[in-house]
């Protein structure tokens, strides 16, 4: 079903559709329109990576291990058996190689291999998330999760969000 961790897997995002592209394709991304994504994919436009955007992205990457640790702690506190299988692994759909996904966290949760997405959220965006413990997440993140499930062939994705770490 999937091809994992190929060293030949290109980092050239114009060559594939990744999880973060899906919301733009569906027209539900708060950051990018379908047309903007199209222009990036054909090389007619380059994503504007401002210093502020790079700083926010880097902070999220630094905090990701903390979010993982908090998630594992919460799952175990709730009586689940949870173990980390992999972090930031890249996958390509075997039949549709243009579909790729990088999974933040892979867990063995109560014996099932599941995907995990770690998010750090600005306090002003907290209203987009449901009550703690609910299944309410922003639609653009749900699309990313569904894409990852499709590419990996798994059936469950856990999203952990650290809200207000700014």
Task: Write out the residue ranges for each language-model feature.
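Nucleic-acid endo/exonuclease domains
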Residues: 52-56, 61, 65-69, 75, ...
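Intrinsically disordered, low-complexity boundary segments flanking structured domains
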Residues: 23-25, 66-70, 157-159
């Amino acid at each position: 079903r999937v091809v994992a961790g190929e060293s030949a897997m290109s980092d050239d995002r114009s060559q594939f559709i990744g999880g973060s592209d899906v919301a733009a394709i569906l027209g539900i991304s708060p950051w990018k329109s379908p047309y903007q994504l199209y222009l990036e994919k054909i090389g007619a436009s380059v994503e504007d990576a401002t210093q502020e955007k790079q700083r926010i992205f880097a902070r999220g990457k630094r905090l990701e291990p903390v979010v993982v640790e908090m998630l594992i702690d919460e799952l175990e506190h709730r009586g689940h058996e949870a173990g980390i299988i992999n972090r930031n692994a890249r996958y390509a759909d075997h039949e549709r190689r243009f579909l790729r996904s990088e999974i933040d966290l892979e867990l063995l949760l109560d014996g099932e291999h599941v995907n995990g997405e770690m998010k750090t959220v600005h306090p002003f965006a907290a209203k987009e998330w449901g009550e703690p413990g609910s299944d309410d997440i922003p639609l653009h993140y749900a699309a990313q999760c569904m894409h990852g499930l499709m590419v990996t062939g798994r059936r469950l994705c856990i999203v952990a969000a650290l809200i207000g770490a700014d």
